[in-house]
Amino acid sequence: GGFSVVQALATLGWASHRGAYFRSELIAALHILDRGAISPQGMTGSYAGAMGQPQFMPSVYLKLAVDYEGQGRPNIWTSTPDSLASIANYLRKSGWHAGEPWGEQVVLGPNIQPAGIDPDQAQPLGSWLSMGVRRLPRAPAAYASLPARLILPDGVGGDSYLVYPNFKVIRRYNPSDFYALSVGLLGDIVT
């Protein structure tokens, strides 16, 4: 976004029901400026203060941004390597398990009644398979012990997915199932 982060946070800090949160983010943004990480004019972001390519809030930048290129400070505004390394650091610190899948698309057998399945109830993969969930031919390596949840993002009749703990980590970055599915599916394509 092209909004001044300082102005956006200052406005929200006093004109929002979440004022205390935005005031603390404003203080974090001022710390970033004080460190010389970016100029006030360059510190742009969303209307809510999310900054740079990864859309980090200032407090997240201070905790997790990475100077991958070795320029002396993380540059999430114009450096793609710094941005990608910062996102990877965010996911790692949020509990990402390298080598484990985020999830997989599955086919529901005729005996499965999706309306009766609690989307918050995780079960081992083997339990889902015994209930009639079928894996697709190009599914990731099976992790029989990983807890999996069944989600139907488009409702009954739409696509079905078993999602593993790494899916929850993606949702810590953005709490939308649609966002997390998009990231997971795109990641599968590029790897």
Pin down the residues of each PLM region.
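Short N-terminal secondary-structure initiator segments
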Residues: 1-15, 105-108, 112
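C-terminal functional modules
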Residues: 138-191
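Primarily short, surface-exposed interaction patches in extracytoplasmic proteins
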Residues: 5-40, 62-70, 74-77
